[in-house]
């Protein structure tokens, strides 16, 4: 006959193993790269397809900024917030209402600084209308669908081969596997975005006051950045994300003073910048701080070894 002690031991093991599997399945996927070269300093599950929540808005912002830069789109033009922007978008902390009028510039601040979903949808709707005549594959698609198509076109151009966007804000959809990306793909996107001065400025703001019109009234709102690490230990961007399926997600950009090397009569300046992408973290800001410290340690070791770059380890 099995003793009570043995039964208790077996029961505890049954409880333990599922917990171990769950913890393993839910571990943070991350990548740490040198922002200058794209060299990967460390990665864990960086090619795993994950849902990424509001990190999606980095792609949303870049489609808008690229449209403005390449096609002369005016970021000071006003957009009218459509009723559809409130469907399934969750919180409305700014207090937008259908029919409110706001500039694209302030919508970008709202989407990037405070991660506002209504703002992201309105950007896609407004710029999608402008893209309809110039996108060959637009067909009869809605403005938002055309815009999301451009988000995926951008992803393809950046070799984000394991990414699929389905909306401009990253909210969970009815299909559990969509949208998705990877830590490595989002590092590629972040390198691209952080090379744009306008984007860098948006995501560097701890606070920003925006204004919008409601009929004859002018409303003001003070945005506060959702990135709690911004401004500490050289962190100068980028974006937070969180949904029920994505968990806590975070992209960090950080810098240190450039390293200056004398080489005979010449001087070489080595910028020191990191990008860290974390998906599915249990505590993104605590873990983000730890990975940042780890990243600089790895960077210093890599720099001391001559900054050798293996193309197979470069994004």
Over which residues does each language-model region extend?
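Positively charged n-region of N-terminal signal peptides that target proteins for export
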Residues: 1-5
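Active-site-adjacent loops and short helices of periplasmic peptidoglycan-processing enzymes
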Residues: 22-184, 194-197
């Amino acid at each position: 006959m099995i003793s009570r002690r043995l039964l208790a031991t077996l029961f505890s093991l049954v409880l333990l193993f599922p917990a171990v599997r769950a913890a393993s399945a839910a571990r943070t996927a991350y990548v740490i790269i040198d922002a200058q070269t794209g060299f990967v300093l460390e990665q864990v599950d960086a090619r795993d397809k994950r849902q990424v929540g509001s990190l999606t808005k980095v792609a949303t912002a870049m489609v808008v900024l690229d449209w403005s830069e390449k096609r002369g789109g005016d970021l000071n033009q006003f957009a009218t917030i459509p009723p559809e922007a409130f469907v399934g978008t969750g919180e409305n902390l700014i207090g937008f209402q259908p029919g409110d009028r706001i500039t694209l510039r302030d919508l970008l601040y709202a989407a990037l600084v405070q991660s506002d979903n209504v703002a992201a949808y309105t950007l896609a709707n407004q710029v999608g209308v402008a893209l309809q005549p110039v996108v060959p594959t637009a067909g009869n698609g809605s403005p938002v669908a055309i815009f999301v198509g451009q988000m995926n076109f951008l992803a393809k151009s950046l070799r984000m081969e394991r990414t699929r966007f389905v909306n401009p804000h990253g909210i969970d959809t009815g299909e559990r596997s969509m949208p998705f990306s990877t830590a490595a793909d989002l590092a590629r996107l972040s390198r691209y975005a952080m090379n744009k001065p306008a984007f860098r400025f948006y995501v560097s703001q701890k606070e920003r006051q925006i204004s919008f019109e409601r009929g004859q009234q002018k409303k003001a709102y003070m945005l506060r950045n959702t990135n709690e690490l911004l401004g500490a230990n050289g962190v100068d961007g980028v974006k937070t994300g969180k949904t029920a399926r994505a968990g806590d997600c975070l992209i960090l950009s950080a810098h240190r003073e450039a390293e200056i090397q004398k080489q005979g009569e010449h001087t070489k300046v080595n910028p020191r910048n990191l990008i860290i992408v974390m998906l599915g973290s249990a505590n993104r800001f605590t873990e983000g701080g730890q990975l940042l410290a780890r990243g600089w340690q790895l960077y210093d070791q890599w720099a001391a070894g001559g900054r050798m770059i293996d193309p197979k380890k470069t994004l």
